[in-house]
Amino acid sequence: MPINRIAIGTPGEASRPDAIRAAFAEFFSMVIFVFAGQGSGMAYGKLTGDGPATPAGLVAASLSHAFALFVAVSVGANVSGGHVNPAVTFGAFIGGNITLLRAILYWIAQLLGAVVACLLLKVSTGGMETAAFSLSYGVTPWNAVVFEIVMTFGLVYTVYATAVDPKKGDIGIIAPLAIGLIVGANILVGGAFDGASMNPAVSFGPAVVSWIWTNHWVYWVGPFIGAAIAAIVYDTIFIGSNGHEPLPSNDF
């Protein structure tokens, strides 16, 4: 079970050069992701005069977040693992793939990156507000929690299958693309209901800059639960001592 591999970390680990570099990688990847993802929504709102939400707007949000996350994960992968998401980091911690001390360092970097990206957007757009995540009419907080659990489960399961699994073989090279695509697909599913965050930092940045915290807890509880379930399920079934055998590379 992954719970047996959970580690706090060693004294001084957070100050090691490799850990500091990894934190910077997470920070800059998050700035790239949030600036492009949140910024695309602001640009769409400006072009449409902040009119009502439309299917075209949802598709645009899906594509922009998918492309931006693909890039953000790719540029950080060789330094920090390209988590770009506190929930992904939590899933890696639950699976014993990162220590708690390094996870905390990642969380700080990710949250700061999201806030900086939103501040940059506010300044560069002449004071436009970054849109805080919110629930649509008729959607209760617990509806949204379930949405976030399921969507984040799919995301972190994809991360484990394409990036964490030591038996992933050649399919590992498509990890950033697969991660971006599952986020884009989930936005098409949940965007009209709760904004489809799957990422506490993505929700935190706009909340800080706009200072709107209504139901903000939803975007932490749901993703962290979904990430933990995905990590435990994938690690227990596929990475454990009696896990699967990798397919020959020519089968991909």
From Swiss-Prot:
Cytoplasmic side: 1-22, 77-114, 165-170, 241-252
Vacuolar topological segments: 44-55, 136-143, 192-219
Subcellular compartments: Vacuole membrane
Secretion signal, residue range per the UniProt entry: none
Keywords: Acetylation, Membrane, Repeat, Stress response, Transmembrane, Transmembrane helix, Transport, Vacuole
Transmembrane stretches, start-end: 23-43, 56-76, 115-135, 144-164, 171-191, 220-240
Modified residues (N-acetylmethionine): M1
Gene Ontology CC entries for this record: vacuolar membrane
Domain of life of the native organism: Eukaryota
Induction remarks: By dehydration. Not affected by water stress.
GO BP of this protein: urea transport; water transport
Membrane topology: Multi-pass membrane protein
One Pfam family linked to the record: MIP
UniProt motif NPA 2: location: 199-201
PROSITE patterns, sorted: MIP (PS00221)
Motif (NPA 1): 85-87
GO terms of molecular function: urea transmembrane transporter activity; water channel activity
Purpose: Potential aquaporin, which may facilitate the transport of water and small neutral solutes across cell membranes.
PANTHER family the record matches: AQUAPORIN TIP1-3 (PTHR45665:SF21), AQUAPORIN-8 (PTHR45665)
Domains as described in the record: Aquaporins contain two tandem repeats each containing three membrane-spanning domains and a pore-forming loop with the signature motif Asn-Pro-Ala (NPA).
Record-stated family: Belongs to the MIP/aquaporin (TC 1.A.8) family. TIP (TC 1.A.8.10) subfamily.
Assembly behavior: Interacts with cucumber mosaic virus (CMV) Protein 1a.
The name this protein goes by in its record: Aquaporin TIP1-3
Organism of this sequence: Arabidopsis thaliana (Mouse-ear cress)
Gene: TIP1-3
